[in-house]
Design a protein with these regions (language model features):
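Short, well-structured N-terminal submotif of metal-dependent ribonuclease cores
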Residues: 1-39, 51-65
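A structural signal for short, well-ordered beta-strand segments and their strand-loop junctions
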Residues: 38-40, 81-82, 121-123, 139
Length: 141
């Protein structure tokens, strides 16, 4: 199995000490980051968008500062960048019959991208684990 594509919720939990799953995500990352971890345009953009949103935290970063935090993390020697190199229909082919709502399409794309790279999607989202895709999802709970 290849690298872990980190869902935005994992990236945020790792970077934000006040996040409820910061410690849990940190322990998981310490065990698995040596296997390689990846981001993509979707997860990177979500990271900057959420960390710079005042609704997320009264201590939200500016977009420029959120971008600096992201860039600092991407300098890790075990980080891989996965471009959004597959189409949406190709990415969703393994789960399209299991999707129940419009809010699942990005998660399904991320899962398809991870599978395309022979990796796993690491997430805090329990709903993704219910899609029945076996070992392609690493649920951090």
């Amino acid at each position: 199995m290849g690298a872990f594509l980190l869902d935005a919720n994992v990236l945020i939990a790792l970077a934000w000490p006040e996040h409820e799953f910061h410690e849990k995500a940190g322990r998981w990352f310490a065990r698995h980051s040596g296997d390689g971890w990846a981001t993509c345009p979707f997860t990177q953009a979500a990271f900057v968008r959420i960390l710079s949103n005042p609704a997320f935290s009264a201590n939200a970063l500016t977009p420029a500062n959120a971008l600096r935090v992201l860039e600092s993390n991407l300098n890790s020697p075990t980080h891989h960048f996965w471009p959004d190199s597959i189409s949406v229909p190709e990415a969703l082919k393994n789960v399209e019959g299991r999707l129940t709502g419009h809010r699942q399409t990005t998660d399904a794309y991320l899962l398809g991208l991870a599978m395309h790279h022979r990796g796993k999607l690491a997430t805090l989202d329990k709903g993704i684990g219910a899609w029945g895709v076996g070992t392609a999802v690493e649920l951090i709970v």
